[in-house]
Each structure stands twice: as C-alpha cells, then as structure tokens.
C-alpha cells in the first residue's frame, strides 16, 4: 500500500503519495491549490492539483466529477492531460497533470510577443479547440491564464472545471469578463462552441496589442466598449435577447458603426486582421469555426489537415442533469478513478484507496 506524505503549503495540508517529492506552490484557484512536484517514477516535473473538500456539497462533488471525466476523456497535444489521480486518507482528491513552465497571461505581461510566436500560439489554441469542440465540449472560460506554455512554445489549454455540454439551452455566469462572448452577457439563455472562438479572438487581439482588447469594469461597461469597436449589434442578434431589462439596455445605447480593426492594430498583417474580424462577430453563427480558422491564410505556415485530429467519440454528458447526493457522486468518482488506473495499468489499487 502507498505511503502518504504530508506537507503544509500556504496553510493547506497536502497529503500525497511518496511517489511525488519537492512540492512547490504554483497557484491558488477557486477550487484548489496547485503545486509543482517531481514524479519519482517517471523523473518528470508534474503539476499536482488538490481539490479541497470535494465531497462537502453535492455541487462541489458534481463539479469535481465533471472535471475528472473531462480530463480522462480529452486526449490531445494541445489539451492538458491527466497522468495520475488519487484520493488521500483525508478524502481530498488530487489530479496530477503535466507541468508547463508558464501561461499566456504571464508571457503577455512580461514582454511583447513576436509575430511568429503569436501565429504559433493561435494555431495551437485553434487546434486544441477543434478537438475539444468535436468532442461536444465547450470550454466556456478561455483566457490567457488558462493557456499553458513551456520553454519549447508547446501550448496546452487547461482548467475544464467550468466546461459544459454543447447545448443550445446553456445558461449561467461564466468566463472572466474581458474574454466573455456577448451572447453570454446579453442573453443568459443559450450559447454554444462559438463562445470559445470569441474568447480566442480576444486573446489573439491581446497578443497583437499587448493589452486586453475589451477591459470592461462591469457588464454594462464591457458591452459598451465592445460596441465602440464593433458597432451596434445587428437587429437579428438583438432580437434573440430574452431578458427585457437587457433588451432595454441594448436599445438605449447610441447607434455605433463598426470601426475597421486596421485602425486599432496598425502593425498587424492584413491576414491577421482578416482572421480577427472573422472571430469577433456579434452573431455567433457567423463566427469562424476552429476548423475554418486553421485553414485561414494567417495560420497557413502551421496548418496541416492530416495532423489536426478530432475526438474519437463525443463526451458523455448523461450525468450532467443528475441531482444526486454526495455519497452517490463519491461512489461514481471512485469508480472513475478505478477505471482510470485499470486502463492505465496502475500497479496497486490499494495505493489509490488507502484504508480509512
């Protein structure tokens, strides 16, 4: 049976198997603490994410289950992948993934990016999104800090905790404001994979300009800034707004014309401007898809249709409408972890489920 080692990180107890050493804090998220560690089995550096009290409420248990299922299902070079998972004696859950040295947010705040890096990063984002969207998954929270990069400029999309099924009736409050698609802000009713394309467009613009494109102070200000550049939304988009208050607000705004993006991005290539124009479109159905973006002239230096795979099968979202007690989520989670280790060839199941 595995030996568990305890360490205090930022006042939090990290309780991990002795396979991992040299714990160093990397970052704190809303639902967990991430540390770097050395995997003594593979001699690689890894990221270890502790999910705090995953079984404290049904909502948190379901969220953790969803993240685990997504990490297990999504297998692609531009998407973060799971290398281990275990439950500690204290019943915290630990996800172990590859460790990349930095993220796009840190890169963008440290120095301007050269053209070839912008191209290569955008290509990898779109390559990852093509795969994720083909699996029937919408990321919903794409932003520079969720895009990890290593010293070879390999890029991986991470943090699928908010990800949801492709569903025309999707609802709710997601995504950091600057990168949030207008249909999320406006309708609060239905959106699809196109929200990720908008977010990627905002990230693309930030790489070109070195600062956020739409830095809104709140929802109202955010939408106002968007219309200053992209003009007033067309009537057919306005007519999809379900909330009367939102509709009143949008109709109260002064009519604005779309500004040429060339005026804003004076140093960018024409092909970069053209692709950005196709990503930042109010009407989601007229936005370029990830597959179309990969074939665009701007990404031509990297585009290879034979090496831009789609998912083998759609992600199974059947659990997502379930309203279950914590104990049921716990049993389902244990089952998923056992399945993961059986498939991956775990040496010993007792290591994953120590006696309580």
UniProtKB/Swiss-Prot annotation:
One of its GO terms (cellular component) is cytoplasm. Proline-directed serine/threonine-protein kinase involved in a signal transduction pathway that is activated by changes in the osmolarity of the extracellular environment. Controls osmotic regulation of transcription of target genes. Residues 20-299 form the Protein kinase domain. This is Mitogen-activated protein kinase hog1. Activated by tyrosine and threonine phosphorylation. It comes from the Eukaryota. The active site is at 141 (proton acceptor). One of its GO terms (biological process) is stress-activated MAPK cascade. It is found in: Cytoplasm; Nucleus. It holds the Pfam family Pkinase. A motif (TXY) lies at residues 171-173. It catalyses: L-seryl-[protein] + ATP = O-phospho-L-seryl-[protein] + ADP + H(+); L-threonyl-[protein] + ATP = O-phospho-L-threonyl-[protein] + ADP + H(+). GO terms for molecular function: ATP binding; MAP kinase activity; protein serine kinase activity. The TXY motif contains the threonine and tyrosine residues whose phosphorylation activates the MAP kinases. The modification Phosphothreonine is found at residue 171. Its EC number is 2.7.11.24. Coiled coil: none annotated. Belongs to the protein kinase superfamily. Ser/Thr protein kinase family. MAP kinase subfamily. HOG1 sub-subfamily. SMART domains: S_TKc (SM00220). ATP binds at residues 26-34, 49. Its main location: cytoplasm. Dually phosphorylated on Thr-171 and Tyr-173, which activates the enzyme. Phosphorylated after osmotic stress. Disulfide bonds: none annotated. InterPro entries: Kinase-like_dom_sf, MAP_kinase, MAP_kinase_CS, MAPK_Sty1/Hog1, Prot_kinase_dom, Protein_kinase_ATP_BS, Ser/Thr_kinase_AS. Gene3D superfamilies: Phosphorylase Kinase, domain 1, Transferase(Phosphotransferase) domain 1. The lineage of its organism: Eukaryota, Fungi, Dikarya, Ascomycota, Pezizomycotina.
